Amino acid sequence: MMRQYELVERVQRYKPDVNEALLNKAYVYAMQKHGSQKRASGDPYFSHPLEVAAILTDMHLDEATIAIALLHDTIEDTTATRQEIDQLFGPEIGKLVEGLTKLKKLDLVSKKAVQAENLRKLLLAISEDVRVLLVKLADRLHNMRTLGVMREDKRLRIAEETMDIYAPLAGRMGMQDMREELEELAFRYINPDAWRAVTDRLAELLEKNRGLLQKIETDLSEIFEKNGIKASVKSRQKKPWSVFRKMETKGLSFEQLSDIFGFRVMVDTVQDCYRALGLIHTTWSMVPGRFKDYISTPKQNDYRSIHTTIIGPSRQRIELQIRTREMDEIAEFGVAAHSIYKDRGSANNPHKISTETNAYAWLRQTIEQLSEGDNPEEFLEHTKLELFQDQVFCFTPKGRLIALPRGATPIDFAYAVHTDIGDSCVGAKVNGRIMPLMTELKNGDEVDIIRSKAQVPPAAWESLVATGKARAAIRRATRSAVRKQYSGLGMRILERAFERAGKPFSKDILKPGLPRLARKDVEDVLAAVGRGELPSADVVKAVYPDYQDTRVTTQNNPAKAGEKGWFNIQNAAGMIFKVPEGGEGAAAKVDPAATTPKPGKRALPIRGTNPDLPVRFAPEGAVPGDRIVGILQPGAGITIYPIQSPALTAYDDQPERWIDVRWDIDDQMSERFPARISVSAINSPGSLAEIAQIAAANDANIHNLSMARTAPDFTEMIIDVEVWDLKHLNRIISQLKESASVSSAKRVNG
């Protein structure tokens, strides 16, 4: 423990005229009152108020605040009384110690209403004397540093309260270093596995880049010295919680983070800040969109600094913060360092927050809410809306508060309420109006989720959400839906396979064959067959070892191609496939004599081409809605490709052949456009007709079909269709995927 003279010396370093008598008297009084009391760790209880006092000396606070820290637990935990403290230390210190005692008692209960009342009293106390906040935050910081000795449930409750209230409150009041440490300690107990993983990765990265950081630090210092700027440069690394939060909110992996390292440049004057900025930007390239000037436009908590990001050595992104030394002190200690309580306070109370400054407008507005008699729980939730600048808080129709990262959508909201609600979400009302599911939510929005039992979350939702929980749930639901589809497909294939083999079939019959197939359960077998990973003949043989499959694929034995129940089209690339007429169930026919439909009379709807050059589409086809590019073919005109076509890689080194073209479509457009679809379907009677019927039902023209591969269970085909536009094509592919006969369907590009 810190000795009495050591405490006095710590304060004397920044305040030579310290009132030693006050510190000595508070030290001795608190030590005697706490006596032989022990903390949960077994340490003397007096070590706690002493450590709280030490934290405040690091913030260069006056002796009265240090004395309050030493005394802050005496009324609650010892025989000390308010009257006694008033007599020994004065009524001002006695009032603050008693106020902190009342707040301390409320900390022991986790009910939301009590927590809300705690926050109300804390904010009201801060408005009267900012030292309440300083001692309270230092008290919470030391408790968090020693939280490991507590029961797990109590650790979690205190850590969550710290993350929810105290860390953002410290940030709001400009005390960034304390906010970061509170967040890191809370993160360690709320999600220990993630904390450990991120911490280990950061340590590895720091060791790997130590030399690079030293080089940049040296280069910066030399540049400033040569140009007559007195500056100190210090490298810094993002904290684990900051890294984890960015990974979660932006859906990034650790490897995708590009600004883990940064540098803080401290100079003497504001003019030097801008001179240093100019030197940095003339030495290294800056990253567009990453410059922020908080000197000319300070943050609400009076934070001032210039932020910029450069491309440093090894092409790494490096963030730099440029500020004066006074700005750095305010950024580190916030209200504790700010002149707001040193020389801007009222004459009666130099520690009262001034109502004239703009530095704490948020706190003044919040205190005004208190006088309006808000319900305590409502006040807690509304205050949280303001505490978390990087989060949005929305409400269910019943008033439940849901916290989400900025950029969250109604889909994130639905999954935050419950996974089942997310899985069944088909729409949302935001503040009573039906809004698109991609709508970005704002603070205070009321969100009502519209549900359907038949809904299955589409995979495309993954790109719309901002939370890891929603993303993981969508992936899980998508996998489950796909697995269910493949299982149904596998069931149909196996029913036919066992029927051909003359063997009875049921799910239970498959169980004895699981070890031979190296599958964990029957559903796994069905899905594997449906995906085409496991041939149906192997399953029959696993159940009936004596079974012999006499069939061969049409690839190896073309003579079998005409066998009943199987289909294959020889030289199909030269044939024209006609969509059947006559409605549902009509048969599909192949007409070798048919010809490709003639193009429409209107010229190709492409702008940006030379009218004297012939224009054609690439074999894989581009349709309206695609981004397109033209490639000049010497002696053959211009070929139009969809921008995603792999064939374009052949022209990467020939930029002179690329032509900027675009669609020129009007409502009277009557032409169809060619596109190519790859389909894998069950090799059974009726499958081809079902595929053709889907095309016909969607007003698409199939003008060519070729078999890419035929196997006992599946056949893979390439279908050339003519469609109106990209939406038309996507609708056809979507319905093909939903067909019970189709294993997969996708567009072919190139």
Curated annotation (Swiss-Prot):
<dbReference type="GO" id="GO:0008893">
    <property type="term" value="F:guanosine-3',5'-bis(diphosphate) 3'-diphosphatase activity"/>
</dbReference>
<dbReference type="InterPro" id="IPR012676">
    <property type="entry name" value="TGS-like"/>
</dbReference>
<comment type="similarity">
    <text>Belongs to the RelA/SpoT family.</text>
</comment>
<dbReference type="Pfam" id="PF02824">
    <property type="entry name" value="TGS"/>
</dbReference>
<dbReference type="Pfam" id="PF13291">
    <property type="entry name" value="ACT_4"/>
</dbReference>
<dbReference type="InterPro" id="IPR043519">
    <property type="entry name" value="NT_sf"/>
</dbReference>
<dbReference type="GO" id="GO:0016301">
    <property type="term" value="F:kinase activity"/>
</dbReference>
<dbReference type="GO" id="GO:0008728">
    <property type="term" value="F:GTP diphosphokinase activity"/>
</dbReference>
<dbReference type="Pfam" id="PF13328">
    <property type="entry name" value="HD_4"/>
</dbReference>
<dbReference type="InterPro" id="IPR004811">
    <property type="entry name" value="RelA/Spo_fam"/>
</dbReference>
<keyword id="KW-0342">GTP-binding</keyword>
<dbReference type="GO" id="GO:0005525">
    <property type="term" value="F:GTP binding"/>
</dbReference>
<protein>
    <recommendedName>
        <fullName>GTP pyrophosphokinase rsh</fullName>
        <ecNumber>2.7.6.5</ecNumber>
    </recommendedName>
</protein>
<dbReference type="InterPro" id="IPR033655">
    <property type="entry name" value="TGS_RelA/SpoT"/>
</dbReference>
<keyword id="KW-0067">ATP-binding</keyword>
<feature type="domain" description="HD">
    <location>
        <begin position="45"/>
        <end position="144"/>
    </location>
</feature>
<keyword id="KW-0547">Nucleotide-binding</keyword>
<dbReference type="InterPro" id="IPR007685">
    <property type="entry name" value="RelA_SpoT"/>
</dbReference>
<feature type="domain" description="TGS">
    <location>
        <begin position="390"/>
        <end position="451"/>
    </location>
</feature>
<dbReference type="InterPro" id="IPR004095">
    <property type="entry name" value="TGS"/>
</dbReference>
<dbReference type="InterPro" id="IPR006674">
    <property type="entry name" value="HD_domain"/>
</dbReference>
<dbReference type="InterPro" id="IPR003607">
    <property type="entry name" value="HD/PDEase_dom"/>
</dbReference>
<dbReference type="Pfam" id="PF19296">
    <property type="entry name" value="RelA_AH_RIS"/>
</dbReference>
<dbReference type="GO" id="GO:0015969">
    <property type="term" value="P:guanosine tetraphosphate metabolic process"/>
</dbReference>
<dbReference type="InterPro" id="IPR045865">
    <property type="entry name" value="ACT-like_dom_sf"/>
</dbReference>
<dbReference type="GO" id="GO:0005524">
    <property type="term" value="F:ATP binding"/>
</dbReference>
<feature type="domain" description="ACT">
    <location>
        <begin position="676"/>
        <end position="750"/>
    </location>
</feature>
<comment type="function">
    <text>Functions as a (p)ppGpp synthase. In eubacteria ppGpp (guanosine 3'-diphosphate 5'-diphosphate) is a mediator of the stringent response that coordinates a variety of cellular activities in response to changes in nutritional abundance. Plays a role in adaptation of Brucella to its intracellular host environment.</text>
</comment>
<dbReference type="Pfam" id="PF04607">
    <property type="entry name" value="RelA_SpoT"/>
</dbReference>
<keyword id="KW-0808">Transferase</keyword>
<dbReference type="GO" id="GO:0042594">
    <property type="term" value="P:response to starvation"/>
</dbReference>
<dbReference type="GO" id="GO:0005886">
    <property type="term" value="C:plasma membrane"/>
</dbReference>
<dbReference type="InterPro" id="IPR045600">
    <property type="entry name" value="RelA/SpoT_AH_RIS"/>
</dbReference>
<dbReference type="InterPro" id="IPR002912">
    <property type="entry name" value="ACT_dom"/>
</dbReference>
<keyword id="KW-0418">Kinase</keyword>
<dbReference type="InterPro" id="IPR012675">
    <property type="entry name" value="Beta-grasp_dom_sf"/>
</dbReference>
<feature type="region of interest" description="Disordered">
    <location>
        <begin position="587"/>
        <end position="613"/>
    </location>
</feature>
